[in-house]
Amino acid sequence: MLEVSNQHIDNKKLSDEELIIAFQNGNVAAFNELVLRYKDKLVNFLFRYTGNRDDAEDLAQDTFVKLYRSKHLYKEIAKFSTWFYTIAINTAKTDSRKKNRYNSISLSEFDPDEDKDYELTANVISPEDSANASMEHHYIQKAIDALEDYFKEVIILRDIQDLDYDEIAEITGLPLGTVKSRINRGREKLKKSLSKIYNNKT
Amino acid sequence: MQEQEEYMEIRDKLKNLPKIKSDDNFEIMLQQKINLAEAEMQTISEKQNYSTDEKKSFFKKIFTRKTNYWLIPALGTVVIILIIVTIYYPYKKTELIPNAPVSQTLSDKVSDSPNVSRQTTIEEKKIENKLAEKNTTSEQSSDVPPKDIKNLDGYYRGGIEKELSQPTPVTPMKSDELRIKKNDDIETINAPAIEEQQKIESKSKESEQKDSRIIESKKEEERKGGDLSIEKSAPANKDEVGKSGKLKGAKEYKKSDKKNNRAVTDSTKTNEDDLEIIRNEILEKEKNK
């Protein structure tokens, strides 16, 4: 028990990169330490990205499972947080694609004269979420959900997760200038949508 | 800086959003998912290992020395047998087919079935003609003297060269006869070989006649000369000898006949040489007497 507790203390002192290397060498306690460090950050990021807590929790668990299975793919060149957020965003994107396939409803079936398809997303905020969060937070989240995915991910990573521009560029795989412009354009869109929401509210 | 100030309000609002924390069951749920993933990985690895083990064991069974080293010569013999069966026998069959007596088989089928009337086609006729021609040409090329005594007499008379140049007579076979069914009447047609043989026989007869004429003329000349007698010259044929019946020099004739046989075996000698030898022999006999 002493050895386990000592190991736990040692893992707390280690950096993320050192922990993942320790896990690669077979130290499962290092993985547990990484889970403790990143589970809340990851759930928060994924909740803002998906707008659904349950989905966020599931996606966060899937991300950790991917980390567990593909630990050997990490190399010391990149920061662990960058690599880990990249996995999280990819899992979130694939999941959203799957859900969009099943939740889309075709209106052309009801109106045969119309050739265009109107796709409606079936994202519904649960009563629990709406009860917990204040109305403002709820509207902000609604405005974030309304953004396109490529604006959403950069704004969340920058303004909510407090990551650097360089790190965001690495995660998204975009040039630094593109990342900055996308962040500004996303903020502009968010501002407009929030003003509309507030105007409608008033 | 102006841009940052412009979006400062939104940035603050986003930063002030409440931090969502994971559930208490998060780690338990994560552990369950990890266990499931490990189980899947194990099944996949087991399948891969099973497939690799199966392959290894298969090759080991065949090629390892410890277990089945005796299989190597056995496999070698099997391979050799296969080669013999697949390559040697087919070639052997192809070699045998051309040597088979085609003429006999084809013609005998026609001739040996007299009760069964068969219609011979033009192609069969052509084949028969070709075969007959081949037989005649092959017999012409051979320098073997005829076995009949009549022909030997002909050689003795001095027609050796002619006989050698002429084709040896071919005995007509039943197979050379073709039976054609025309309006329920069976007609027999002689093959060209028979016709050729008949021609050859007629030629040989003519040559014999010529020889006999020459001999007779010689005898007459000898009579005129008064030195030579009929007794010491061999007759044209044995039949003639039989007819005359009372030849005094019968023993001498036998001896000369043997010598003639020897002369026939020496087929390389020319006709003129033979004639000279015969004359010399006759002269010597007369001198001895």
What kind of feature is each model-predicted range?
Chain A
Residues S96-E119, A131:
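Short, basic/polar amphipathic helix motif occurring as a linker/hinge flanking DNA-binding modules
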Residues H72-E76, T86-L107, R185:
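Arg/Lys-rich amphipathic alpha helix in sigma70-family domain 2
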Residues N44, D58-V65, A78-N90:
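Structural recognition of an alpha-helix C-terminal capping motif at a helix-to-coil junction
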Residues L14, Q141-T178, K192:
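Helix-turn-helix DNA-binding module
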Residues M1-K41, K192, T202:
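N-terminal module of bacterial RNA polymerase sigma factors
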Residues Q24-N25, F64-K79, K98-K99:
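Sigma70-family region 2
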Residues E114-K142:
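Acidic, proline/glycine-rich intrinsically disordered inter-domain spacer in sigma factors
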Residues V35-R53, S70, I144, S193-K196:
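Amphipathic, Lys/Arg- and hydrophobic-enriched alpha-helical face
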